[in-house]
Amino acid sequence: MADKSDSEAVALLMEAIVTTPDTNSEPQYQSQHRDLQECYYSDSDNEKATEFLRRIGKHQHKKKNSVKKRVTFLVYF
């Protein structure tokens, strides 16, 4: 069973704003208060997706006796 930090990390990851890679097309989800060219998480106005994932990865490696879990996300454009 996942601990609280794992559950929060997955919840934050699921709340990501997904934008299309083509800058000429309309994004699937438009945020009124964030830059549409970047992918940010709903709990942070300045943490990018890559920074968030890097922080979670560092946290996971520091945990002792943790069970590695694989989470797969499908993003449709």
UniProtKB/Swiss-Prot annotation:
Belongs to the alphaherpesvirinae envelope protein US9 family. Coiled coil: none annotated. A motif (Di-leucine internalization motif) lies at residues 12-13. This is Envelope protein US9 homolog. InterPro entries: Herpes_US9. GO terms for cellular component: host cell. It comes from Cercopithecine herpesvirus 9 (strain DHV) (CeHV-9). GO terms for biological process: intracellular transport of virus.
